[in-house]
Amino acid sequence: MSQRDTLVHLFAGGCGGTVGAILTCPLEVVKTRLQSSSVTLYISEVQLNTMAGASVNRVVSPGPLHCLKVILEKEGPRSLFRGLGPNLVGVAPSRAIYFAAYSNCKEKLNDVFDPDSTQVHMISAAMAGFTAITATNPIWLIKTRLQLDARNRGERRMGAFECVRKVYQTDGLKGFYRGMSASYAGISETVIHFVIYESIKQKLLEYKTASTMENDEESVKEASDFVGMMLAAATSKTCATTIAYPHEVVRTRLREEGTKYRSFFQTLSLLVQEEGYGSLYRGLTTHLVRQIPNTAIMMATYELVVYLLNG
């Protein structure tokens, strides 16, 4: 792969990630709040014990719409874009690093394994995910802290630089890498996503090639091709997210301030013991509602930019 090709994939990946992050930020905030252990968004329901006449409070997790309503009422619409700054700072380099690493790794592995085989896509996706996570974890930690910083209207909100200073004063440099073990576990989601995506993309390409050969036409990119890529991305991301979602909840808990959660497996075990298996999928609906369009937008933007820059 030439230096120009690498730069094209870097730029295209950055563009795709940025567009997706801006359009889906409110859903990201709601999802992060639902994943956290914060009690401020919980609802206490009173149940009467008809035998003894006593009342018992039962704490339940709010749904996405209730969470959205609480944020709008107590904090205002601007709170739905909490953490967008770090998100934009992180998403462009993260996606750029990811796509560049993925493309480079795939090109090299094609010389070792069968070109564009499942092994190639799996290893490339894993290596790209590992590289991007290691490089950008501090940015995502700050983003999560800002999104969990619930303040009422009129109260001074914590800024990104204040959050950085607070993390450093409390935990030092290692504090910026909390939750990274859960992110590494999440590489499985990335691998599943790209294997399915590349498989669907290949099938679509084979179908179009066969169609153009039958009609004796030259193969050119059309709007329907990008729609197909968006559907491929949405389908693959839905499957991958549903399978690997628990790591998202664990990661959010590990990134909370002053948390009792220390490691990936300790957090996973504690969640199941204290809140049940359902807690591992808290916020999944919101996450899917956000991730499906976000991934579709990101992948289509990436493919479009690569196509335009390569002429």
From Swiss-Prot:
The keyword Lyase does not apply. InterPro entries: Mit_carrier, Mitochondrial_sb/sol_carrier, Mt_carrier_dom_sf, SLC25A33/36-like. The keyword Iron-sulfur does not apply. GO terms for molecular function: pyrimidine nucleotide transmembrane transporter activity. It is linked to Hyperinsulinemic hypoglycemia, familial, 8: A form of hyperinsulinemic hypoglycemia, a clinically and genetically heterogeneous disorder characterized by inappropriate insulin secretion from the pancreatic beta-cells in the presence of low blood glucose levels. HHF8 is an autosomal recessive form characterized by episodes of symptomatic hypoglycemia provoked by protein feeding, and persistent mild hyperammonemia. Affected children tend to have recurrent generalized seizures. It comes from the Eukaryota. The lineage of its organism: Eukaryota, Metazoa, Chordata, Craniata, Vertebrata. Inhibited by pyridoxal 5'-phosphate, 4,7-diphenyl-1,10-phenanthroline, tannic acid, and mercurials (mercury dichloride, Mersalyl acid, p-hydroxymercuribenzoate). Signal peptide: none annotated. Solcar repeats lie at residues 4-108, 116-203, 224-308. The gene is SLC25A36. This is Solute carrier family 25 member 36. Widely expressed at moderate level. Expressed most strongly in pancreas. Mitochondrial transporter that imports/exports pyrimidine nucleotides into and from mitochondria. Selectively transports cytosine, guanosine, inosine and uridine (deoxy)nucleoside mono-, di-, and triphosphates by antiport mechanism. Catalyzes uniport at much lower rate. May import (deoxy)nucleoside triphosphates in exchange for intramitochondrial (deoxy)nucleoside mono- and diphosphates, thus providing precursors necessary for de novo synthesis of mitochondrial DNA and RNA while exporting products of their catabolism. Gene3D superfamilies: Mitochondrial carrier domain. It comes from Homo sapiens (Human). The chain crosses the membrane at residues 7-27, 41-57, 111-131, 180-200, 226-246, 291-311. Belongs to the mitochondrial carrier (TC 2.A.29) family. One of its GO terms (biological process) is mitochondrial genome maintenance. It is a multi-pass membrane protein.
